[in-house]
Regions:
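N-terminal intrinsically disordered/low-complexity leader segments
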Residues: 1-27, 216-221
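Solvent-exposed, amphipathic alpha-helical segments
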Residues: 31, 35-43, 85, 89-93, ...
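Hydrophobic alpha-helical connector segments
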Residues: 77, 92-121, 201
Length: 221
């Protein structure tokens, strides 16, 4: 004789320490990402094992594989976390100056170098280690680079003069400027931040000003 299961016996996972099962799972995932940012940024992706990440996060391997299929998947999540934090930081500083190109550029540059200096481990992951592990990051690296280029295009377009180039040429110019800024940050990190921030900001401001005059950006002509 078969009996029908009583629906009342099927209970959701009970809260533990005031947190639901999903909240605890999210917290474990975040702990793994934070651990990966620290270790990948300090030691490099190739030198860090899953065991090291779990030890840093104070979690077992069971919880690693609950959240990520592989070390490469965690690398992608760590890189995305840091780049998202950086973009949010520069947008906060740039947003009040969207109608004033020189102030907009200065705010963005000061926060870029400021973010790198305040967060050297995150900056190494985002600016240096990411270059070394582009193969493991897959499309993520190119996508975030393109996001940076697109941000520059979006904030510049409303300020363009009549002699603006075609969109394709404009995009090449934006990629060149972004590439120069990333390379400068990489060199700054490699020299242990030897050059003062004010000099970096002034030098890159002049670069942006030259591009701005070429484009006829209001405030530079």
């Amino acid at each position: 004789m078969t009996t029908q299961a009583d629906d009342s016996s099927i209970k959701p996972a009970r809260p533990y320490a005031g947190k639901s099962a999903q909240e605890r799972q999210n917290a474990r995932r975040l702990a793994l990402v934070d651990a990966a940012v620290r270790l990948f940024g300090e030691q490099g992706f190739s030198a860090v094992s899953i065991d090291m990440i779990c030890a840093e996060a104070a979690l077992t391997k069971r919880y690693f594989y609950e959240a990520f299929a592989s070390r490469e998947a965690l690398l992608t999540a760590a890189y995305e976390s840091v780049t998202r934090e950086y973009f949010q930081a520069i947008l906060v500083k740039m947003t009040p100056h969207m109608a004033d190109a020189p102030k907009l550029v200065r705010a963005g540059l000061k926060e870029t170098f400021g973010f790198v200096r305040r967060n050297p481990v995150k900056a190494r992951l985002m600016m240096v280690e990411a270059m070394n592990v582009r193969g493991q990051l897959g499309d993520m690296y190119g996508a975030r680079y393109d996001d940076f280029v697109e941000l520059l295009l979006q904030v510049t377009r409303p300020l363009l003069g009549r002699q603006a180039p075609s969109d394709k040429v404009f995009r090449v110019m934006a990629k060149a400027v972004v590439g120069a800024l990333i390379h400068l940050c990489q060199n700054w990190i490699a020299t242990d931040f030897a050059q003062p921030v004010d000099e970096l900001v002034e030098g890159t401001e002049r670069l942006f000003a030259g591009v701005g005059r070429e484009l006829g950006v209001r405030g530079y002509n």
